[in-house]
Amino acid sequence: MENMAEEELLPQEKVEVVQVPVPTPTPDSARVPAPAPDSAPVSASTPAPASAPTPASAPVPAPALAQASALSPSLASAPDEAESKRHISIQRQLADLEKLAFVTEGDCDSANSLNSDNLDAGNKQACPLCPKEKFRACNSHKLHRHLQNLHWKVSVEFEGYRMCICHLPCRPVKPNIIGEQISSKMGAHYHCIICSATITRRTDMLGHVRRHVNKGETKSRYIAASAAKPPKEILKEADTDVQVCPNYTVPQKTDSYFNPKMKLNRQLIFCTLAALAKERKPLECLDAFGATGIMGLQWAKHLGNAVKVTINDLNENSVTLIQENCHLNKLKVVVDSKEKEEREDILEEGEENLGNIKVTKMDANVLMHLRSFDFIHLDPFGTSVNYLDSAFRNIRNLGIVSVTSTDISSLYAKAQHVARRHYGCNIVRTEYYKELAARIVVAAVARAAARCNKGIEVLFAVALEHFVLVVVRVLRGPTSADETAKKIQYLIHCQWCEERIFQKDGNMVEENPYRQLPCNCHGSMPGKTAIELGPLWSSSLFNTGFLKRMLSESLHHGLDDIQTLIKTLIFESECTPQFSVHAPSNLNKPEECGVFIKTTDDTTTDSHSAQGKRKSNETTANLVKRQKTDVNTEHPPFYYNIHRHSIKGMNMPKLKKFLCYLSQAGFRVSRTHFDPMGVRTDAPLMQFKSILLKYSTPTYTGGQSEGHVQPASEDTVADRVEMSVNDKAEAGGCRRW
């Protein structure tokens, strides 16, 4: 191949000009390929009769001939210019590939004919896809077997075309530093019919074509009439318009992903930022993975000058779509990227500029290392652990970092090995798996913050069907980092009754760790009954004061979809019943269901946009003092599912009444957003089952109805069961809370 390449380089250096005879195609012979459109122009005169070929009137350089020989002769008469650029290794049938090696006798007059390399003495033919050194000229039947076995059988099929394997030196020859041209060595390879890329392995070529199909790039360059791009759809959410590409709900088929199911996530983050904007202004905000830019557009459109929004994305198509969406919402775009793109923002007459948005195109880790922000939101595809270190590197003091994790298969214990790989955590499927997932993410966030000498305060954590959202406030200093690191502990989980308790602090090895569990399953069941999960976040997951300010902002901006969820989070953080069974709550009062809602005027008194260094220091100290007060009232960890612990043959009480029964027994109790039938309480599992059994009624079948139950017999049965449960608890030495 090197000798052949050197022979081809000699006429390039001398730049010879030769006259190329262009034969007139006949019905019994193959057409001679036409020159490429981007090669030297060849003007052919009026064709003569078929017996005498007409030479071209314009001189053609020798390098242009080599480029013209790589074109398909079967498409020389095609009207489309893009169709003639297809490589000769891409054909429809095997016969078309064989025609490339066939040349009529009249074409052999000139030594510099287009297919002179394909002929040899004795009417032998050479392979059009192999150099002379690899496959010498041979007879037609032998060439047929060679093309069929070596090129056609290992081809890749796509839309009726076959991308055959090619052995020619197809890489362009580039001069080195001295100026000498050195031929590039390339083995067997394929040419992509869509993007003309060169792929070495067949499996890689299949994956390459599959990626084109997933992105909708099936309209390749050989199609004569290229179809117009499908129109973009405009969606509206929270008074913000966004253009979305086709297949916007499938990440594999679009460059700009938009998930309508994440609406609750976007509204929660908006209320978080709105509550933070009441403390200090202006805020440097970052949406590290913009996609369509819907989240950053909502920030800038509804919060105005209180925020300075930066939307980042590494995909060039997404950056272009973000800029278009900014203009659609009358927002000025400030472009900042490594490629130094410059685009003028032109507004139509009568339009008003609502604000500025900075759009960047770079890696999220690089951007967070270069600039400091007050608010950072991370929403990557899958896990977010790869971006936590850079997020806490330059975050300002008392700033907020929100993390959305969509790798629910690993967090919800469906792929336990992936959770161990990403989070360094050992988990199993439990009844409280959603809260377990939230504590796993918080533990990863806490470790990343501690590595940067920063601590965290968890404002709230939400785990729903499609995502896990964790929002934390950053506290600078090694003292805060040490306090945060102490809250990461292991969890002891009983596999029989699913009782759980955090392991005690200490470096000493305990002889019998089963003693820490309130249950007596280890003594009554054979073998090892408990496992160790974690490390997990063991402290509170909610900040009541911040959640109340979020509820106020949701009322102020009219976000009705998340008000019920925020109220549930508030009651869950306080661990108090949301309602009274006999007295209905009045939702018209400022105090809704036991939650006092601050107005906008009240929240301004807590603002931290103070003037002067001394005043700002005082407000910061007050803020930290208020945060410590909120953290002290921690809610009980984890919850119990009332259906999971129901008694066979008994009808459970209503969930509302059961919460009151637990509260009357002296336990803290509330519902949880993690599970619609879950109960968060500080009661141990044995007491939980005892109260559930006490107020359950027997199930009757047959002609009797459930309402005909004698109260005396019911109390007697419940008392007996409770006494037996208490006797077992006292015999096992269990601690009753």
UniProtKB/Swiss-Prot annotation:
Chain ranges of the Trm1 methyltransferase domain: 233-692
Family: Belongs to the class I-like SAM-binding methyltransferase superfamily. Trm1 family.
SUPFAM superfamilies, per the entry: S-adenosyl-L-methionine-dependent methyltransferases
Short motif (Nucleolar localization signal): ranges: 141-145
Keyword field contains tRNA-binding: yes
GO molecular function, one term: tRNA (guanine) methyltransferase activity
Residues at which S-adenosyl-L-methionine binds: 266, 313, 363-364
GO biological process, one term: tRNA N2-guanine methylation
InterPro entries documented for this protein: SAM-dependent_MTases_sf (IPR029063), Trm1 (IPR002905), tRNA_met_Trm1_C (IPR042296), Znf_C2H2_type (IPR013087)
Protein name: tRNA (guanine(27)-N(2))-dimethyltransferase
Main enzyme class: transferase
Native species: Bos taurus (Bovine)
Binding site for Zn(2+): 494, 497, 519, 521
Subcellular location: Nucleus, Nucleolus
GO CC term, one of those recorded: nucleolus
Biased segments, Low complexity type: 17-49
